[in-house]
């Protein structure tokens, strides 16, 4: 049985979701998700994309970020996207379904990118949220660790990693560790994130 507290929380989220200006705008523009606008904001502030870039999108479904990236890099660019969930085809994006934290899927990623000069790895992925920080924080940090580990193998010199995390216990320590591994790293908090959201994005340059 679903608790009344959880039911009320879900109903409140649904109400906020459908009233959200970015959800409405995404529907109007036929954009796959409101996260498109987060990436647009981060890109405008940091100039992430250039025509002809090669991009890896981890945790890509439903495809908002891949959709935005494909528009920015043009026909000469390349995007490889991966998610455990299915994703409808996007022109200019190669997609395969699988868990990138799984060794078999990771090997497929590495094989597909073996001859690619990869400029950007991006991940808007989050674990299934429990609402319990002591569970959610280790899970999101583990995802971040995997993304950064993948970057060690495939990211070109001066390449960039953009990955979602949460503010909470353990993040500051993890961020300090990453400072030692990249020439530049900073935290981005898009205005397009929901006001109550703890999500932040790490932007790191090799």
UniProtKB/Swiss-Prot annotation:
The catalytic residues are 164 (proton acceptor)
Give compartment(s). Cytoplasm
What GO molecular function annotation could you give as one example from this UniProt entry? rRNA (uridine-2'-O-)-methyltransferase activity
Sites binding S-adenosyl-L-methionine sit at 63, 65, 83, 99, 124
Q: What's a single GO CC term here? A: cytoplasm
The record, for HAMAP family, names: RNA_methyltr_E
Question: Family, per the entry?
Answer: Belongs to the class I-like SAM-binding methyltransferase superfamily. RNA methyltransferase RlmE family.
The name on file for this protein is Ribosomal RNA large subunit methyltransferase E
Source organism of this protein record: Buchnera aphidicola subsp. Schizaphis graminum (strain Sg)
């Amino acid at each position: 049985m679903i608790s009344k507290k959880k039911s009320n929380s879900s109903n409140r989220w649904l109400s906020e979701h459908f009233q959200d200006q970015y959800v409405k705008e995404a529907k109007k523009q036929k954009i796959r998700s409101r996260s498109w606008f987060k990436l647009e904001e981060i890109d405008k502030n940091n100039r992430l994309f250039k025509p002809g870039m090669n991009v890896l999108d981890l945790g890509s479904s439903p495809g908002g970020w891949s959709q935005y990236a494909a528009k920015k890099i043009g026909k000469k660019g390349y995007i490889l996207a991966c998610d455990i969930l299915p994703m409808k085809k996007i022109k200019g994006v190669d997609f395969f379904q699988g868990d990138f934290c799984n060794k078999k899927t990771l090997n497929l990623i590495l094989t597909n990118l073996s001859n690619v000069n990869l400029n950007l790895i991006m991940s808007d992925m989050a674990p299934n949220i429990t609402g319990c920080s002591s569970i959610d924080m280790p899970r999101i940090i583990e995802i971040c660790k995997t993304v950064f580990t993948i970057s060690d193998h495939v990211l070109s010199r001066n390449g960039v990693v953009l990955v979602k995390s949460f503010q909470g216990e353990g993040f500051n320590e993890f961020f300090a560790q990453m400072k030692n591994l990249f020439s530049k790293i900073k935290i981005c908090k898009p205005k397009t994130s929901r006001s109550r959201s703890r999500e932040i994005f790490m932007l790191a340059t090799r």
